Structures are given as structure tokens and as C-alpha cells.
């Protein structure tokens, strides 16, 4: 008998607003807890959470808000900087946001008196994704509906600018070879750029469109995953520029794709909030069906924990967390 994969969230945290985006800090911050940031209609909250899976004396989840940052406009995207450190004196919290007013804001805080932000302007349409340089964090990349990928330094100056053939949906930096950048376009093309030569070196093609989200697998950078139309799609760049595996998953169109940080076979997808609730699914490449299905009334955002097989999704006045096995 087939086991039902539908699960309620293992843990929830109440929030003061509808959560548009949520991001675990993917970098080591020097503290045993996990930094998490989420964005609402006009603010960003940075908090710390610890789960019973990592600390036996905790029951469920322990969550504490560290700081709320006024944002003044809806938060659409959040990216953590590797410069964030909780074990330094004073601590450093550094992240950037993309917003509905087409601006990027770079926030820096010591969680006490120093709270600064800088505005980066240049995109002429909606910003779909942004990411920091994963080593030094001295640059960030963004992609937009304005058919560009832009690289910025922390002063707000553009250091590179790539013209795309369609809206840029996702951007990822290679974790080790930091001169390589992946950009996914809505027309189904994923290109890899050499930032030293400032040119494309490789491209992948999806047969489905619109491509809404793509992600580079950090555990195995030969693997790229995406969602387009109703399907999830996996490429192995050593084999072909065409997909290795494709599977339909979300009836109301797929929305987001994220690889787990700890396994090259584990990934999560979300659907658009459609006629039913928005569906959240965890998939394992060894299984033909999703290994976990969750339902969120109005879900948005998707992020994996840095060291656990645990996913966060934003909801209506709450954060929801699902746990699976590897």
C-alpha cells in the first residue's frame, strides 16, 4: 500500500504579518543556532532558531527575534552575506533585499546601535532574485524582468552588466569557483557566465516554459534543477544541455525550486497559490513520487536549513517548517 506523503508542518512560528519571503542564512555564522530572515509588507525580521533535531534539550523549535528592520515597502527577496558573524565583537548582521519599488537595499547591523542601509538603484523592472559573492561577500548579483543580470559592489556601483533575452528569474554563484555565475531566464535558457572574461561559457535548455526558478546544486555543481510550467527539471551539465529528468508536479504551475544544502538528491518545489492551497513538495531523485507534500493556504518563499533536511516556507502570519529524512 502506498504511504500517504501529506504532512502538516512539523513546527510553526507566529509572525505579525503575511510572510512574502524567508531565507535561512546559508553560511556559517559562528553560533550554534540558525539565523533566519523573513520579509513582510514593510519590514524584515532577523531571528534565531534552533530545532530539537540539533539540540536534544529543546522541544520542537526555539525561536527568538533578534531585530526588526523597517523597510517601508513590500520585501520580495532576501540574500544573506557571508560577512554575517555572530561570534565577532560586535556581531555583524549583513543581508540585502529586493523590493517592489525596484530597489536593492543593503542592510548592516551590530544588533545594537549601528543599523545602516544603502540603496542600490539601476533595475527598471521587477527584481526576481539576488545573491552575494559566497566567499568574501564584496559583490552581489541580481536579475530582473528588465532582461539584465547586474553585478554590484557594496558601494552600490555596477561592476558588470549582462543583457538577457528574456526576464532573469534566478541567479546563483558557484560556491568554490567564484568567477562562475549561473543565470536562469524565463524563456527556459540557463547560462553560465565567466565573470573574469564577462561572457557566457555554457548554456542549458528547458523544453518547458515559462521557467520560474532554477538552482545550482551546491553539493554537486554538475547538477542544476529548475521548475518550468508544471514540471521540475534536472540537468547534469557533464552529459547534455538538455534535461536528464523531468516530472510534472504542480497542477497550478510550479513556482520555486531549491536544492537541499546537505544532499545532491534532495530538493523542494512549491506551486502557485491556485484554486487549492499552495502546495509544497520535497522530492528525492531515487523516488518517483514526492517524499513529502505540505499544504499552505498562501505560501511564499522557500529555504533549506544549512545542516538539516528541514525546509521553511512563509505563510499567512506564520513561518512553517517541514522535516524529512535524507
From Swiss-Prot:
UniProt keyword terms in alphabetical order: Cell cycle, Cell division, Centromere, Chromosome, Chromosome partition, Kinetochore, Mitosis, mRNA transport, Nuclear pore complex, Nucleus, Protein transport, Repeat, Translocation, Transport, WD repeat
Short name of one Pfam family: WD40
Source taxon at top rank: Eukaryota
A GO BP annotation: nucleocytoplasmic transport
Gene3D superfamilies with a match to the protein in the record: YVTN repeat-like/Quinoprotein amine dehydrogenase
Ranges: WD repeats: 70-117, 122-162, 164-203, 294-325
GO-annotated cellular components: kinetochore; nuclear envelope; nuclear pore; nuclear pore outer ring; nucleoplasm
Coiled coil region boundaries: none
Cellular compartment(s): Chromosome, Centromere, Kinetochore; Nucleus, Nuclear pore complex
SUBUNIT field: Component of the Nup107-160 subcomplex of the nuclear pore complex (NPC). The Nup107-160 subcomplex includes NUP160, NUP133, NUP107, NUP98, NUP85, NUP43, NUP37, SEH1 and SEC13.
Function comment: Component of the Nup107-160 subcomplex of the nuclear pore complex (NPC). The Nup107-160 subcomplex is required for the assembly of a functional NPC. The Nup107-160 subcomplex is also required for normal kinetochore microtubule attachment, mitotic progression and chromosome segregation.
The name this protein goes by in its record: Nucleoporin Nup37
Native organism: Mus musculus
Gene: Nup37
Amino acid at each position: 500500500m502506498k504511504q500517504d506523503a501529506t504532512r502538516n508542518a512539523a513546527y510553526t512560528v507566529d509572525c505579525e504579518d503575511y510572510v512574502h519571503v524567508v531565507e535561512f542564512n546559508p553560511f556559517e555564522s559562528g553560533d550554534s543556532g540558525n539565523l533566519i530572515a523573513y520579509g513582510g509588507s514593510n519590514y524584515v525580521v532577523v531571528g534565531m532558531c534552533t530545532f530539537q533535531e540539533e539540540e536534544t534539550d529543546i522541544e520542537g523549535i526555539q525561536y527568538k527575534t533578534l531585530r526588526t528592520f523597517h523597510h517601508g515597502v513590500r520585501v520580495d527577496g532576501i540574500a544573506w552575506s557571508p560577512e554575517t558573524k555572530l561570534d565577532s565583537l560586535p556581531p555583524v548582521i549583513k543581508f540585502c533585499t529586493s523590493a517592489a519599488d525596484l530597489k536593492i537595499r543593503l542592510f548592516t547591523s551590530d544588533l545594537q546601535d549601528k543599523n545602516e542601509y544603502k540603496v542600490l538603484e539601476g533595475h527598471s523592472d521587477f527584481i526576481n532574485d539576488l545573491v552575494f559573492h559566497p566567499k568574501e561577500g564584496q559583490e552581489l548579483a541580481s536579475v530582473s524582468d528588465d532582461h539584465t543580470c547586474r553585478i554590484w559592489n557594496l558601494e552600490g556601483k555596477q561592476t558588470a552588466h549582462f543583457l538577457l533575452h528574456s526576464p532573469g528569474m534566478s541567479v546563483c554563484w558557484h560556491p568554490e569557483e567564484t568567477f562562475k555565475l549561473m543565470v536562469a531566464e524565463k524563456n527556459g535558457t540557463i547560462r553560465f557566465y565567466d565573470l573574469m572574461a564577462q561572457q557566457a561559457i555554457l548554456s542549458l535548455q528547458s523544453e518547458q516554459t515559462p521557467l520560474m526558478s532554477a538552482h545550482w546544486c551546491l553539493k554537486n555543481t554538475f547538477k542544476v534543477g529548475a521548475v518550468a510550467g508544471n514540471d521540475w527539471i534536472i540537468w547534469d551539465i557533464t552529459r547534455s544541455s538538455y534535461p536528464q529528468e523531468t516530472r510534472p508536479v504542480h497542477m497550478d504551475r510550479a513556482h520555486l525550486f531549491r536544492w537541499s544544502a546537505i544532499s545532491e538528491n534532495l530538493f523542494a518545489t512549491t506551486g502557485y497559490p491556485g484554486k487549492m492551497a499552495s502546495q509544497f513538495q520535497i522530492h528525492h531523485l531515487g523516488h518517483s513520487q514526492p517524499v513529502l507534500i505540505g499544504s499552505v493556504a498562501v505560501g511564499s518563499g522557500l529555504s533549506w536549513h544549512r545542516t538539516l533536511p528541514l525546509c521553511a516556507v512563509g505563510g499567512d502570519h506564520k513561518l512553517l517548517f517541514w522535516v524529512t529524512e535524507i
